[in-house]
Amino acid sequence: MKVAVVGGGWAGLAAAVEAVRAGHAVTLHEASRQFGGRARSLSLAFPDGRDVVLDNGQHILIGAYSQTLGLMRTVGVDPAQVLHRLPLTLRFPDCDGIALPDWPAPLDAGWGIATARGWSWRDKLSLLRHAAAWQLRGFACDDTLTVAALCKQLRPAVMQGLVEPLCVAALNTPADQASARVFLRVLRDALFGAPQGTWGASNLLLPRVDLGRVLPSAAIAWLEREGADVMVGSRVQAIESSGATWLVDGRPFDAVVLACPSSEAQRLVGAAGIEAGDWLARAGSLAYKAIATVYTTGGPRLDVPMLTLRSDVDSPAQFVFDRSQLGGPDGLLAWVASASDGDTATLEAKVVRQAARLGWTVQPLRTVVEKRATFACTPGLRRPATFIAPGLVAAGDYVEGPYPATLEGAVRAAQAAVTALSGASRKAG
């Protein structure tokens, strides 16, 4: 089949690679001048005139991201060369919190809970009892529950030191608003997922090169070597059904994968003259949350690449990353405020004060705000389906699936979309 993939973010790249591997002739359209979507590189100018390539936001992968890691290997990227691995660690600057040892699951989680600092034995037993109950239920629960409701019997120290930061990191949604079902799915895969070689499913994987080198650059090079038509700066204006084919800006294709942002997909589907009311309604009902990354200079070298922070309205960042341990210059810190709001100047001022309360003096360098970073992962959410119309599918982290808006969610959605097209093609044949 001739397949058009609209969008060159991680979902679009995954869809294009999967389609080529399935034997299809692929044309990839990317509207901007850069591939990677919301996980892309950017250049930062330092006060001394140096240019440093960083990212539009600090991303975290985990060892359970099997499809993302597999995609990287397919296009020639060795994850061990571009990702810094460390066992799951949610430690605060005062050293309280949990840090798992580099052991097989579930021994790592058990020991991490037993040795968590700042927790009483009652706190630890509370978490162990809840974890055992969740496992007995297959990490499933009523779809109407929030994470806060699911964990209402947990001790406050565990909620504040583990559940709340883990929830906002994974779902970008506060615990009192976040879907317990999706949260449990992430926990299940992280705690009991299959290891990736020597990497445990719960391991944190932090990029130590810019995001362009983690996947997009290699994926584009691979696609071009395999004969795909890669078009950059090519915003698709319209798609149209024409009998058994689809016209993409007048060019005929057998199938189309919409791997662009949901707003762009809605624009194209809404003007395509097809019956897609339910899909459009679901896509249009999604609410979105921002993620802000404040880059600062002058910070100390941290004991570990990543620290968890106690966050409130005056201390917006939930995590801080020492970029000097991840391939960046000394003193560069990345402060991540998930589910953030407010203007950039106010956010920067709050982060500077948050750092001062830790005894650190920092200066803002640049703040990147992705206003539509993720959908709000709330209970009972009805996400749009992969299938839109015969020969037309959607791929993206917002599409129906078990994961929240993550890189793994985007890759899995893309692969599912291409599988659906290939299956339909075989049936038609």
What do the predicted segments below correspond to?
Residues 22, 234-346, 358, 384:
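Mid-domain catalytic core of redox enzymes
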Residues 38-41, 47-83:
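Conserved FAD-binding subdomain of flavin-dependent enzymes
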Residues 188-246, 252-255:
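Helical element adjacent to the flavin cofactor pocket in flavoenzyme catalytic cores
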